[in-house]
From Swiss-Prot:
Name the record gives this protein: Isopropyl malate synthase gloH
Lineage summary: Eukaryota, Fungi, Dikarya, Ascomycota, Pezizomycotina
Similarity field: Belongs to the alpha-IPM synthase/homocitrate synthase family. LeuA type 2 subfamily.
A Gene Ontology cellular-component term: mitochondrion
GO terms (BP aspect): L-leucine biosynthetic process
Domain Pyruvate carboxyltransferase: 47-325
InterPro entries in the cross-refs: AIPM/Hcit_synth_CS, Aldolase_TIM, LeuA-like_post-cat, LeuA_allosteric_dom_sf, PYR_CT
NCBIfam families membership: PRK03739.1
Length: 617
């Protein structure tokens, strides 16, 4: 057995017998930028966003979108707020060309503030086709691209550097002649962009020469700058190296005010978002990407992650992801690609905490913020900074969001707080108590929460899966005998329609004294020894103070045996609620709180009556 030093001193042998260093080492171009400025900067404004879902995203699909699917995706992008959308590669297929024409020729299809962009190779025939596809557009971006690195130029294009620059100059001048300089096309407001394919592996001075050539050939202005796209076509370095490359280009290109630097990153090393963020610090003006990080190989930059990163720093992005679940649904239907449950912001598990310590921290953080009082059971919607629920319209606290383990308010993305807590065998009493509070309006005491959490953990282990919020609430009603006709009707009365917001912040009151008196009466009546060891209750009321009901929680010793049993009672009066909880506890034998858990793992949980909030009692 070799020791650690010996193992790390051995050269790794890659496929083909090459050493690791000779095969992969020192591939990134060397750039000297000792006076770099980007590390000391801070993002304070959003870049221009370009969606390339209909181009880069579409070409990466096993089954490219049909015209109908493209149309649906375009409408989705417009509804989100994208004002620059790359819609096609017109010379690639008739479908691409026809879709572009459909967007232009269909009245009202393209809003006045949306600019269509098409992508074209740096060839005159392809450029001509692309321009024809845009004929009649109110405003359009013609975007060419050309390989920039020596490797691509020599291997793929097989051109010298002089020939390469001449091709770029010739194609840009041709594009200009048939767009903004052509009287027949002058009604369209033309913008022009040029993509530096494999910029991340290009020599900095060569990229600059190409940029100057393009700028001179197009003739941009401050009001209509030329777009120069700097791409990590295949991510090859750490994000800081790419930031240095972008800053070098931004600082050295002449007439910088006439240039819009567009950042196009890929996720081959998992750093697409980080690379784009640092590139914006280094001078990037526009960011290109796809929803949910779709794109070739490991994907393009995820526009949702990048924009929400800025959103959570208080930066207005101009993009609306307040109904992210609906956006995800449309995306998955159109692309036939699933969104990973751990995807930042949009995955099913992004907000969800399973660990007990995390759940407890979230519960306490929300309570401190004062959100529990304003949170109804079920879906919470956001509208202009207000919580809307029935007739209640309460302002959210204006303090900075600081809830442990929740990077942002789930409601800002259209998620309900039911999505925050996930229960499995690792969960603690705090999260379970919170779900009961949200689902049933019961502020259960810590001792009961600890008792019930053990039951839930056993059930989770037995079923070999986590439990949904509705299951946990349903099981609570079953365990504590709250499914009787009387209780069900009362709970339905409390929850039906939610015409009023239930106050989730009701404080527990000690009810031990009245419970002990009632316990003595029950002992005489039933002929068993019932001793109340703990009792509490609280009012279930609306935010405007109307009392709706009472709930009581009692812990009892039956016939002086252990463990103690719990009873929960719901009634219109406190006294009746205490009595009912004692009666339910007295009927129970110690250790019988755990019913048969032989339930199919694949069983579909049916919503409980009390959760049908729209159903009138």
């Amino acid at each position: 057995m070799k020791n650690t030093d010996e193992r790390y001193s051995m050269a790794t042998c890659c496929a083909g017998g090459q050493s690791l260093r000779s095969k992969y080492g020192e591939r990134a171009p060397n750039i000297q930028l000792s006076d770099r400025q980007w590390p000391s900067k801070k993002l304070t404004k959003s870049p221009i966003w370009l969606s390339t879902d209909l181009r880069d995203g579409n070409q990466a699909l096993p089954n490219p979108m049909t015209l109908q699917q493209k149309w649906r995706m375009f409408q989705l992008l417009v509804s989100i707020g994208f004002t620059q959308i790359e819609v096609s590669f017109p010379c690639a297929s008739q479908t691409e060309f026809d879709f572009t024409r459909q967007l232009i020729e269909t009245p009202g299809a393209t809003p006045d503030d949306v600019t269509l962009e098409v992508l074209s190779p740096c060839r005159e025939d392809a450029i001509a086709t692309s321009v024809r596809s845009l004929k009649g557009a109110k405003q359009a971006i013609l975007f060419l691209y050309l390989a920039t690195s020596d490797n691509y130029r020599e291997t793929v294009l097989q051109l010298s550097e002089a020939e390469w620059l001449d091709q770029a100059k010739r194609c840009v001048e041709y594009a200009r002649s048939i767009t903004k300089d052509d009287p027949e096309n002058c009604r369209t407001k033309w913008s022009f962009g040029f993509g530096f394919e494999d910029f991340a592996n290009a020599r900095p001075e060569a990229a600059l020469r190409l940029g100057e050539t393009i700028k001179t050939a197009w003739g941009p202005s401050k009001d209509n700058p030329v777009i120069l796209g700097l791409a990590t076509s295949v991510e090859a370095t750490t994000p800081n190296v790419f930031a240095d490359q972008v800053e070098y280009f931004s600082r050295n290109i002449t007439e910088r005010e006439k240039v819009c630097i567009s950042i196009h990153t890929h996720n081959d090393r998992g750093g697409a978002v980080a690379s784009a963020e640092l590139a914006c610090l280094a001078g990037g003006d526009r960011v290109e990407g796809c929803l949910f990080g779709n794109g070739e190989r490991a994907g393009n930059l995820d526009l949702i992650t990048c924009s929400m990163n800025m959103f959570t720093q208080g930066i207005e992005t101009g993009l609306d992801f307040s109904d992210l679940l609906e956006i995800r649904r449309v995306y998955e239907e159109v692309t036939n690609l699933p969104v990973h449950p751990r995807q930042p912001y949009s995955g099913d598990f992004y907000f969800r905490a399973f660990a007990g310590a995390h759940q407890d921290a979230i519960r306490k953080g929300l309570a401190k913020r004062g959100r529990l009082a304003a949170m109804p059971s079920g879906l919470t919607q956001m509208s202009k900074g207000m919580i809307i629920n029935g007739t209640s319209n309460e302002k959210i606290p204006s303090s900075t969001w600081r809830v442990p383990y929740l990077p942002l308010d789930p409601a800002d993305l259209g998620f309900s707080f039911d999505s925050v807590i996930g229960v499995n065998s690792q969960s603690g009493k705090g999260g379970i108590a919170w779900l009961i509070q949200q689902g049933l309006g019961f502020n259960i005491p810590n001792e009961l929460a600890a008792h019930y959490s053990q039951i839930i953990k056993k059930r989770s282990v037995s079923l070999e899966r986590g439990l949904a919020a509705e299951e946990i609430c349903d099981f609570f009603l079953e365990i504590y005998d709250l499914k009787s006709s009387y209780n069900t009707q009362l709970l339905k009365r409390l929850h039906s329609g939610f015409s009023q917001t239930i106050d989730m912040q009701q404080e527990l009151e000690d009810a031990t004294a009245p419970a002990n008196n009632a316990a003595m009466d029950i002992s005489k009546t039933m002929g068993i020894d019932v001793h109340c060891t703990m009792a509490s209750s609280h009012v279930i009321s609306s935010h405007d103070g109307e009392q709706l009901s009472n709930v009581a929680f009692v812990q009892c010793e039956i016939e002086q045996t252990t463990p103690c049993v719990w009873g929960v009672g719901v009634a219109l009066s406190r006294e009746e609620a205490v009595n009912r909880s004692l009666l339910l506890a007295a009927r129970r034998k110690p250790g019988t709180e755990t019913p048969d858990t032989k339930t199919s793992v694949n069983a579909i949980i049916q919503p409980l009556e009390v959760y049908s909030f729209s159903q009138k009692a």
